[in-house]
Amino acid sequence: RPLAADGRPCSAFLTGGVGTGKTVTAKRFCADLARYCQQHNRLLDVIFVNCRIRNTEYGVILEILRYFDRGFPDRGFATDEMLDSLKKHLELNRRPAVIVLDEVDNLLRNNSRNLVYQLSRFSEDLPNPSTLSLIMISQFSVAEMLDEASMSTFKRANAVRFNRYTEDELLQIINARAAEALEPDTLLPPEAAMIAKQAAEYGDARFAIEILERAASVAETEPEGNICPDDIRTAGSSVYSDVSEAKLDDLDDNRRLALLAIARAIKD
C-alpha cells in the first residue's frame, strides 16, 4: 500500500519450495501494481533478475542497468561505478522502481550480501518519487543468509511463505491449464485427478503442468486425441520434479542413506 499510494519504498521476502508459485505470484503482483499506478497517472519500473543465471554482484547490476540502457557495456566498469550509474537513471526517470531478485539464495551464497544491503538503502539517497523497492524470492529463509547490517534494513519487510500445493489445489491448476490450452473434453475428470495425485507427492505445480503437457503431446499422436491413463503414465515416467535442498531436508534418514548409496554408485 505505501508504494501504491505515494511511492514509498517497500521490501518483501517470498520463500517456499520449487513449484509453489513464488515467481508467478511476484510477476502477477508487479503487473497488477504497475496497472494500478498507470490508472492513477503514475508509472512504475519493474526489473526481474534471475539470480541463478546472474549469480554475481556484477551480473545482477548489469542486468538492472540494461533495463534502463540496453547498450550498457558488459565490461570496463567497477561495481561502484555501475551503482552510481543506476542511481542516475533512477533520478532521471523520476518514478519508483521495483527490483525482483528471483532465486536470490544463489547470489547470497556467493558472498554478495553487500549488494542486497546497498540496494535496500538506495532510496535514502534518492529524491521522491525516485524510490527503489526490493522483492527477494528464495527456497530458503533469506533472513538466515543476510548479515546483521543488511537484516536491519528489512525489519519491516513483508514475509510470505508459500506452502506446497495440496492435491485439490493441483487439480484446480490442472483443470485451469487444460481449459486454456486443450480442446474441450481432451482431459476428463478422472485423468485430471490422476495427474493431481501423481504431482501431490511433491506439491509442485510445475511438475503437474509438465505431466499435463507431455501427456497431451502423447495423446496428439493417437487416433482418439484424448488423454488416457497410459498417456499420463508415459508422461510421468519422463518428467521429474526438480531436486532441491529443501526437498532433501524432507527425506527421512533411511531415504537419505539410500540416495547417498545411489549417488556413490553412480560416481564410481
What are these regions (language model features)?
Residues R1-A5:
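Pre-Walker A adenine-sensing motif
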Residues D6-P9, D45, I53-E63, Y67-A157, ...:
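Mid-core helix/loop region of P-loop NTP-binding domains shared across ATPases and GTPases
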Residues G7-R28:
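Walker A/P-loop nucleotide-binding motif
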Residues A12-F13, Y36-R52:
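Conserved catalytic segments around the Walker B and adjacent sensor/switch elements
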Residues A31-L33, L126:
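N-terminal low-complexity, intrinsically disordered segments
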Residues A178:
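Conserved phosphate-handling catalytic cores of large alpha/beta enzymes
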Residues P229-D268:
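Winged-helix-like regulatory helical subdomains adjacent to P-loop NTPase cores
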